């Protein structure tokens, strides 16, 4: 299943009800918007496939937006889930994958009120050029059953590079957790706020602010 959308006046790909996409092989969503969200999943939506790929670009909204306070987005992939965009925002979601990779290139990322479970590796990479955080986690339960959890945040302005903002659980009991944050000015490289728990065979934290 392949969906491609482009918009200059709203959301490019917009699933706002109860949508179910099932594919034996791949689900690929690609969106571009200059005034809204490139990919917008709001409501009770379920995507199931071997591989799920979301790619978005937006100049004034979220490149990838999975959020709804009254609904839940569910993503199930036996192999890989890959998300890439200028900003990636994941809220109120349940995600299961073999491997999970997120790359936000301009305005950071957020994972909150979400359960993310991967059989193997989880890689979160995000850069922010504004006051927002690079990798931002809050009320998130992130588990790698047999692999590693890696978060790499970069803040070029006054945002926080890698920010765990409370009620975050990172569990890689059979692997390692590696958090890296590169901040700028008064911004933190790595910031822990509230109650957070990290569990792994090895944990490495590397923070820098220049």
Sequence positions of predicted segments:
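Residues on the solvent-exposed faces and adjacent turns
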Residues: 5-7, 17, 23-25, 31-33, ...
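Structural detector of coil-to-beta-strand junctions
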Residues: 12, 38-40, 63, 101, ...
